[in-house]
């Protein structure tokens, strides 16, 4: 609805998948909007590796899906979104393990996050508490209003993303001469 469109403007550029967007919104939105209120989340952060980390992964740089930092900047948590597509080819799991080990060798706390973990409220709450521990931040239970906001956010996030924007079987498209969205059949 209108709320989802408003919230979607809060997502920075750089998300590589709907899973990363969902995770970013759940962690980064203010609690009043249903998120956890973590500040300063960065998406797809390029990390130049040290010599020892390069020896582990065989690359000079890697990318972190989401990077959370403590308010004082002294602690960081690298979150790697482990979507279904990330392990589609033989050897992907081993490459991911090498990348995580290289980041850990450089001092990063690394969390591997699955869609199942973010979509299940109890699992997600446990992950949030773990992130707080890693960042040396205090976790505070949500108020009843914040819980309602989270329920609403989850109902809008966990949808079929391939159907977003479809109205009566038609996809809104932007016409070069138009100043507003108009519905058009996809084959146009």
Label for each model-derived stretch:
Residues 1-188:
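Surface segments flanking catalytic/ligand-binding clefts of nucleic-acid enzymes
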């Amino acid at each position: 609805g209108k709320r989802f469109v408003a919230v979607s403007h809060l997502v920075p550029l750089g998300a590589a998948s709907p899973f990363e967007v969902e995770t970013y919104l759940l962690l980064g939105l203010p609690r009043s909007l249903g998120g956890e209120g973590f500040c300063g989340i960065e998406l797809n952060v390029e990390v130049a590796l040290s010599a020892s980390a390069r020896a582990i992964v065989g690359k000079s740089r890697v990318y972190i899906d989401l990077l959370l930092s403590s308010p004082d900047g002294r602690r960081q948590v690298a979150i790697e979104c482990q979507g279904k597509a990330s392990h589609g080819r033989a050897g992907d799991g081993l490459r991911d393990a090498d990348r995580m080990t290289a980041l850990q060798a450089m001092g990063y706390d690394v969390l591997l996050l699955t869609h199942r973990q973010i979509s299940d409220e109890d699992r997600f709450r446990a992950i949030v508490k773990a992130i707080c521990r890693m960042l040396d931040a205090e976790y505070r239970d949500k108020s009843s209003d914040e819980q309602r906001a989270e329920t609403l956010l989850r109902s809008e996030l966990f949808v079929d993303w391939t159907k977003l924007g479809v109205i009566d079987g038609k996809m809104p498209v932007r016409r070069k001469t138009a100043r507003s969205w108009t519905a058009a059949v996809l084959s146009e």
